[in-house]
C-alpha cells in the first residue's frame, strides 16, 4: 500500500490493531481539505504522521502466521541471528522462488548481498513430505531450510517466512528468529478472495496488487462479484 484515501472529514474510529504489521508512516494518507489537523490528532490515525525509527528487536516467542500452520514445534532458548543470513542455496528449478526469497530478505532485513552469510537458507523439493503445495520450514541455529512437495510448496514456505520476519514494532528489523519446525499443507483445494467491483469501481492496477497479497496468505482464486442478476 502506497496511498490511502479517506473521504470523511471527521476521522472514523480506528481500532488499535488496524494496519497491524504495516508501516503506515511509509503510506501517504490523503484526507479532505481542512481535515488534516483532525486526523493528525485522532487516535491511531496519528500514526500516519510519525517519523520512522530504526529499531532492532527480537521476535516474539511464537509467530503470528495467517493461515495458522498445521504444525509448529518450537525449540525454546534457541535462536538464529538474522544478521548472518544472506546466502541462498537452491536448484535451478527453483530460480523463481529464489528470486522471491531475495525480495523478502531485501524488504524485511535490508539484505543486498546474497552470496555471503554464515547461515544459509536452503530451498529444496521433496515429494515425500506430503501432497501438492505442502511444505516444511525449519529454523535452527545453523540456518533455514524450506522444503516443498513442489515449487508451489516452497513458495508458500517463503511466504510463511515473510510473515515471520514482520516485526511487532513498525519500521524495525528482527535481530533473531526463534528456532521452530513448521509443517503445513492446504486444507482446501481452493482458497478464494471475493472482491465486489459490482458496487464500487476497482482499478485494474489495484486488482493486480490484491493478487500479490493473496499469494502472501496462500490464496489461489480471485472471485470478481460483477452482478447480482
Regions found by a protein language model. Give the residues of each.
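Short loop/turn motifs at secondary-structure junctions
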Residues: 1, 25, 189, 218-220
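Solvent-exposed loop and capping/linker segments of extracellular ligand-binding repeat ectodomains
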Residues: 1-55
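Hydrophobic residues within beta-strands of alpha/beta enzymes
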Residues: 4, 29, 193, 222-224
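Solvent-exposed loop/turn segments at secondary-structure junctions
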Residues: 35-36, 151-153, 200, 228-229
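Short, solvent-exposed loop/turn elements at domain surfaces
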Residues: 37-40, 96-98, 130-132, 200-203
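Acidic, contiguous N-terminal accessory segments
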Residues: 55-189
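An acidic-aromatic substrate-binding cleft motif
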Residues: 180-202, 209, 215-217
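Aromatic-lined carbohydrate-binding/catalytic grooves of carbohydrate-active enzymes
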Residues: 217-229
Amino acid at each position: 500500500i502506497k496511498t490511502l484515501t479517506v473521504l470523511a472529514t471527521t476521522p472514523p474510529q480506528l481500532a488499535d490493531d488496524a494496519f497491524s504489521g504495516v508501516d503506515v508512516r511509509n503510506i501517504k494518507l490523503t484526507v479532505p481539505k481542512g481535515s488534516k489537523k483532525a486526523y493528525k490528532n485522532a487516535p491511531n490515525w496519528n500514526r500516519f504522521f510519525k517519523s520512522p525509527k530504526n529499531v532492532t528487536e527480537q521476535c516474539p516467542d511464537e509467530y503470528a502466521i495467517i493461515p495458522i500452520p498445521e504444525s509448529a514445534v518450537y525449540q525454546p532458548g534457541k535462536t538464529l541471528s538474522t544478521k548472518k543470513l544472506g546466502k541462498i542455496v537452491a536448484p535451478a528449478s527453483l530460480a523463481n522462488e529464489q528470486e522471491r526469497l531475495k525480495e523478502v530478505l531485501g524488504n524485511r532485513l535490508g539484505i543486498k548481498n546474497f552470496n555471503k552469510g554464515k547461515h544459509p537458507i536452503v530451498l529444496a523439493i521433496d515429494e515425500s513430505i506430503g501432497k501438492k503445495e505442502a511444505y516444511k520450514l525449519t529454523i535452527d541455529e545453523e540456518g533455514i531450510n524450506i522444503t516443498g512437495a513442489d515449487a508451489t510448496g516452497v513458495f508458500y514456505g517463503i511466504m510463511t517466512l515473510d510473515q515471520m520476519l514482520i516485526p511487532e514494532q513498525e519500521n524495525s528489523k528482527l535481530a533473531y528468529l526463534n528456532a521452530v519446525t513448521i509443517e503445513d499443507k492446504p486444507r482446501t483445494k481452493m482458497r478464494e478472495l471475493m472482491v465486489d467491483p459490482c458496487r464500487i469501481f476497482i482499478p485494474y492496477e489495484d486488482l493486480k496488487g490484491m493478487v500479490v497479497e493473496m499469494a502472501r496468505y496462500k490464496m489461489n482464486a480471485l472471485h470478481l462479484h460483477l452482478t447480482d442478476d
